Structures are given as C-alpha cells and as structure tokens.
C-alpha cells in the first residue's frame, strides 16, 4: 500500500511520498502488449537459433487509443557485432525497418510502425540488464510507446531437468533517485492465430539467409587479414563450413519440414472445404 501525506475522502490522493507512484500512474505510456502468435513463433525461432550469442529484431504494429500495443509482425535484423552478453545492429537496418513498416502500412491500410524491439538472453535471466534498460530509455525518448521484449532461452529447470523459455516485456522509467533508469514490467498477452500471416512467414523464411550472411561477414572479415598463415586460413575455412552445416541441420532442415507439413495441412483443409462446398451446393439445389 502506498503511503500518502494527505488524504481526502478516504481515497483521493493529493501528494505521494514515493516518486515511483507517480511514475507508474502517469509516466507509463503503455498499458499492455498484445503479441500475435505468428509473430511470437518467429521471435522464438530466432531466439533459439543460436545458443552462444544474443539476437535482436524489431516489432511492427500499432498502438490503439487504450494505449495497448498490438504487434502484428517482426523484422529479423542482421547483427553487426555478435557477443554473448549484447548485440549491435547498424543504423542502416533501423532505417530499412522503418521503410518496411511504411510498406506494411500501405499494404494493410493500418497505421503500422516500429513499436518495439526484442532480443534473446541465452543461458541467463529474463530480466533486462542495466544496458538493456538504458537502451530502452533511449528508444522511448523518440517514442513513448516503444516497448522491449526479452526471450530467455536454453534455461534448464533444476527440478524437472527440462528446458524452458521465459519471456517478458518492459519499459524504462526514471529511477527514484539519481539519473539512472529502472524497468517497469508491461503485461504481455499472446493472441492465438489459426494460420501464420504472410509477413511473419516471410520473416521466418528469411532467418536462415540472415544467419548465413552473418557467418559470411565474419569469415570475410577474418579472411581479409594479411598476417594469417595458410594453415590458419584453412582452419578458418573449415570452421566456416562447419557453422553453415550446423545451421542447415538446426535451422533450415526443421524449417523446411515445418513448411512441408503446413503445406500438406493446407491441402487437406482445401479438400475438406471443397467437400463442404459440394454438400452445401447440393442442399441448395434441393430447395
């Protein structure tokens, strides 16, 4: 319960002692986030694509009058720097994401824009680090409704010895004291969809190509060093080939199998719908 220095009519608060009260009540620009299940699927596939480094992407959607962020699709970004505790992208990709949001807005006739970002936390807690909180605060300076999503993966439950994935949504607010920021957890709801949307399907198919480009960029950057001896270059080439094969086995293969299964499922649905159409046509003709 919040402490108040003055109370009127039992309930009306005039002055709160804690700055956090006003922060939560007035400064929070977003009430909740609705993440569509097909966009959630792409985020999960992206987060699980690599166990050693963090990955990052941008969320495309809209904000309604009730201050609820609706995330309809995501854009997978190619990393310019791969580390286990942080991820960096180029400004050109942010500009390209804004252009993609404008294209989706024209295609759907809805006010689509970049409404948030997501990244993974492999093997660590789902809660944002101080770097994440500062990054989120920087984004909110440009857009108060901007949100951050974190997917914590490759976490083992100590009791059941099974893997689990945790996710959260947050924003940043000014801390009670000092110039630092602190996180506010935003309620997030996954909205079920019977089928995957076209934009999310394109993002899912794009994932193997982006991962391959990242490996190629890393290999070319190292291979261009002039001081490497031939044995080292051969070794680096072998590592590059091994990484590509691992991606094909862990990402491209399962994705292809999933797409083939979805295609077969769609064919069966078409057959079922055609039979229903014939029955309805016969019933209509009998009237």
Curated annotation (Swiss-Prot):
Enzyme Commission code: 3.4.19.-
InterPro entries for this protein: BRCC36_C, JAMM/MPN+_dom, JAMM_MPN+_peptidase_M67A, MPN, MPN_BRCC36
Alphabetized SMART domains for the sequence: JAB_MPN
GO CC, one annotated term: BRCA1-A complex
Protein name per Swiss-Prot or TrEMBL: Lys-63-specific deubiquitinase
Gene that produces this protein: brcc3
Record keywords, A-Z: Cell cycle, Cell division, Coiled coil, Cytoplasm, Cytoskeleton, Hydrolase, Metal-binding, Metalloprotease, Mitosis, Nucleus, Protease, Ubl conjugation pathway, Zinc
Subcellular location: Nucleus; Cytoplasm; Cytoplasm, Cytoskeleton, Spindle pole
Complex formation: Monomer. Homodimer. Component of the BRISC complex, at least composed of abraxas2, brcc3, babam1 and babam2. Interacts with abraxas2; the interaction is direct and may form a heterotetramer. Component of the BRCA1-A complex. Both the BRCA1-A complex and the BRISC complex bind polyubiquitin.
GO annotation, biological process: angiogenesis; cell division; double-strand break repair; protein K63-linked deubiquitination; proteolysis
